[in-house]
Amino acid sequence: MKKIQFFDTTLRDGEQTPGVNFDVKEKIQIALQLEKLGIDVIEAGFPISSPGDFECVKAIAKAIKHCSVTGLARCVEADIDRAEEALKDAVSPQIHIFLATSDVHMEYKLKMSRAEVLASIKHHISYARQKFDVVQFSPEDATRSDRAFLIEAVQTAIDAGATVINIPDTVGYTNPTEFGQLFQDLRREIKQFDDIIFASHCHDDLGMATANALAAIENGARRVEGTINGIGERAGNTALEEVAVALHIRKDFYQAETNIVLNQFKNSSDLISRLSGMPVPRNKAVIGGNAYAHESGIHQDGVLKNPDTYEIITPALVGVDKNSLPLGKLSGKHAFNTRMEEMGYTLSEQEQKDAFKRFKQLADAKKDVTEEDLHALILGQSSESHDAFELKHLQVQYVTGGVQGAIVRIEERDGALIEDAATGSGSIEAIYNTINRLMKQDIELTDYRIQAITAGQDAQAEVHVVIKDDNGTEFHGIGIDFDVLTASAKAYLQASGKSKSTSKQADFEEVK
C-alpha cells in the first residue's frame, strides 16, 4: 500500500485569501494544530516577501518538532538564502522553489525565453541543493504549459538535484482525466524518477480541485498539497480534509494510507475558520454543519435503523462530537484545561491562567459554556493580547433627525488614551466614523457579519468585519462580546490596527 504525504499551505497560499491576515501568534497556533493533525510538511510562508513573513517562518520552524517545515522561494539566490536563514532551527527543513513554464507566463510576466528559464532552474535548484536535503520544484502554471517543454523543465530540475516535483494547476484549468494523464506522461518520460516524489497543487476555479488531486494520486503522485477548508485565493485550493477522508473511505480503490489523524479535522477546521473569518459553508463536504444532518423522512428512518444506510462517514471519524457536555461556573481548572487540549489548543501556563480567568467571568454570565463559547473565548484572548489598540469606553446616543452619535475611547499600546466622537446614520456607522477619526484613516468597510455564537438569550455576539485601505489591501477583524455594538467596535478596531501595522511595515521597507 502506497504512502501519501500531506503538504499544508494554509499559512502561505491560504493566507492569500482576500481579507485573511494571520499574525505570528495565530500562525504558530495553526501550525501546532496542523502538527497534531499529522501533516507531513507545513509551508510556513514566503520568507523574503516581508520581515513579518520571515519572522513567522522562523518562529514556526522553531516551534514545530514532529514534521517538516518549508518556505517558498523564487529562482533567486537571495530568496533561497533568506529561506535557509528562516528555517535554520527546523528539525526537518525543506525548500519550495518555483518558476513559471507556460508560454503566457514566460512572455508577459517573466519576460524570459525557454532557454533562460531552463538555465535558471538548473542554477537555482543546484544552489538550493547545497543548502537543503529536500528541494521541491514547482513549474508554475504547469497545466497550461507546453507538454514537451514542461517535461524538459522537470527533467532539468531533477538533474540539478530536485527531490520533489510538484505540478501546480495554478489557475484551476485542468480536469481529472487530463491531470491524471499528465502524471502518467511524467512517469513515462522522466529519467531516473524512482526516487522522486511527485506532488499535486490544485486550485478550485472550476470546482475540481479535490477530484484533480485524487486523479494525481491515482496516477502516481505521492504528495498532495492543499489547505484546511480549501481556503486560498480566488476559488481556493484542494481541501485536504476531503482528500484524506476520501483516501480513508475508499482505501479499497486508492490503496493508500497517510499519517493524518482524521479526528483532528474538526478542531483544525474550526480554528482556521475563526482565525481567518471565513465561515465553513453548511453544505461543505466532510466538515460542514449539514454533513451529518438528514432532513428527508426516509433518510431519517434509515439512519435511525442503521447509520450505514445513508452515512458513509461517521461524525466521530473527523472529530465531530455530538455529545460534548458544556462546562459551567462550578467546573474546575483541570476540566477546563483538558477541554482546551481536546479542542486542539496548546496554551502556555500564563495563557491557561488568563483563559481560565476569562472562562470564570463567562460562566458567571452564562448558564452553560459550550464548545463554541470556548472557541470564541480563546479567539478573543488571542486577538486582544496582541492588538495595538484596546477599546476602553463606548457610548452611543441618539442625536436628532434619526442621527446617532458615538463616543469612543481607546488605549494605545504605550498606554496613552485617546478619545473622540462622531455621528452617523446608525449606531454602527457612528462608532466606525469615530474610530476613523481616532485612527486618522480613510478606509472602506467591505464586509460586516454578525452571528450568535450559541443559541439562547445569553448568547455572545461574534462580529467579523473586512476593511480595505487605499492600496486595495483587505484586513479582517473579529470582535466578541455580549453587547453587539461593543463586539462591532472591537472588530473594526482590530482590523484598523492591522491596517496601521502593515502601513508602518511598508514605510519601513520603503526606507530600507
From Swiss-Prot:
Chain residues that bind Mn(2+): D13, H201, H203, N237
| Catalysed transformations (reactions) | 3-methyl-2-oxobutanoate + acetyl-CoA + H2O = (2S)-2-isopropylmalate + CoA + H(+)
Q: What UniProt keywords apply to this chain's record, in alphabetical order?
A: Amino-acid biosynthesis, Branched-chain amino acid biosynthesis, Cytoplasm, Leucine biosynthesis, Manganese, Metal-binding, Transferase
- In which pathway is this protein known to take part? Amino-acid biosynthesis; L-leucine biosynthesis; L-leucine from 3-methyl-2-oxobutanoate: step 1/4
As for subcellular location, the record says: Cytoplasm
Per the entry, which co-factors are needed?
Answer: Mn(2+)
What InterPro entries does its record include? Answer: 2-IPM_HCS-like, 2-isopropylmalate_synth_dimer, AIPM/Hcit_synth_CS, Aldolase_TIM, LeuA/HCS_post-cat, LeuA_allosteric_dom_sf, LeuA_bact_synth, PYR_CT
This one is known as: 2-isopropylmalate synthase
Q: Which organism is it from?
A: Listeria innocua serovar 6a (strain ATCC BAA-680 / CLIP 11262)
Supply the source organism's classification. Bacteria, Bacillati, Bacillota, Bacilli, Bacillales
Q: Quick one: which gene encodes this? A: leuA
